[in-house]
Amino acid sequence: MGKRLISQNRGRGTPKYRSPTHKRKGAVKYRSYDEMEKDGKILGTVVDILHDPGRSAPVAKVRFANDEERLVLIPEGIQVGEEIECGISAEIKPGNVLPLGEIPEGIPVYNIETIPGDGGKLVRSGGCYAHVVSHDVGKTIVKLPSGFSKVLNPACRATVGVVAGGGRKEKPFVKAGKKHHSLSAKAIAWPKVRGVAMNAVDHPYGGGRHQHLGKPSSVSRHTSPGRKVGHIASRRTGRK
């Protein structure tokens, strides 16, 4: 009898494939969208900068004027002790949070809300930023890092600047163990062994005197879970 495939183990939800969110510092999102932000602004002070396991960017603990504390994504150039502003009348400065409708065209932004008050959903990885392209009646167009232009509500908030931690890809891992530990913080199993490199008991493509599939790579959508590898329910395969 063969062994379970990686996809079967992942679906079972074993600890190896569960994201260790209990190690995170907490929810990283904007404060509630209250009248203080809608009518003016509120000041906050960066009291600490923290490393959040599994996140590619550092987070800052910010204490606001009403003694509320939040974890926020910080831009490049922010340090402990600096003040940030949140609200419709905030200054256009890195780290400040404003509605998209109040941010001029061409300004880099990140941690963009898709619905006003959702806390920020888009452009949150280290070194990423989007651009405000244009404003129109009831909508703002933002160009995302992928090149896709998204139409958003002008009341959606965003942070001015570029997410910190942009140089992380310039330093190589050097050792395989370091990469393993880095990806395990996100529940990504690494290294990934090819099916043809396995034994026959471990994978449908395993075994043989040399590495080859030995069978068609197309399988039915209704085939058994232990055989569902390759091109699943493919209409066609190969180059056009």
From Swiss-Prot:
UniProt feature, compositional bias: Polar residues: 1-11
Source superkingdom: Archaea
Annotated stretches, region: Disordered: 1-28, 206-240
Single Gene Ontology BP annotation: cytoplasmic translation
A Gene Ontology molecular function term of the record: rRNA binding
Entries under SMART domains matching the protein: Ribosomal_L2, Ribosomal_L2_C
Keywords noted in UniProt: Ribonucleoprotein, Ribosomal protein, RNA-binding, rRNA-binding
Cellular component GO terms held in the UniProt record: cytosolic large ribosomal subunit
Alphabetical list of InterPro entries matching this protein: NA-bd_OB-fold (IPR012340), Rib_uL2_dom2 (IPR014722), Ribosomal_uL2 (IPR002171), Ribosomal_uL2_arc_euk (IPR023672), Ribosomal_uL2_C (IPR022669), Ribosomal_uL2_CS (IPR022671), Ribosomal_uL2_dom3 (IPR014726), Ribosomal_uL2_RNA-bd_dom (IPR022666)
Composition bias, Basic residues: 13-28, 224-240
Quaternary state and interactors: Part of the 50S ribosomal subunit. Forms a bridge to the 30S subunit in the 70S ribosome.
Biological function: One of the primary rRNA binding proteins. Required for association of the 30S and 50S subunits to form the 70S ribosome, for tRNA binding and peptide bond formation. It has been suggested to have peptidyltransferase activity; this is somewhat controversial. Makes several contacts with the 16S rRNA in the 70S ribosome.
Family assignment from sequence similarity: Belongs to the universal ribosomal protein uL2 family.
HAMAP family: Ribosomal_uL2_A
NCBIfam families for this protein: PRK09612.1
Descriptive protein name: Large ribosomal subunit protein uL2
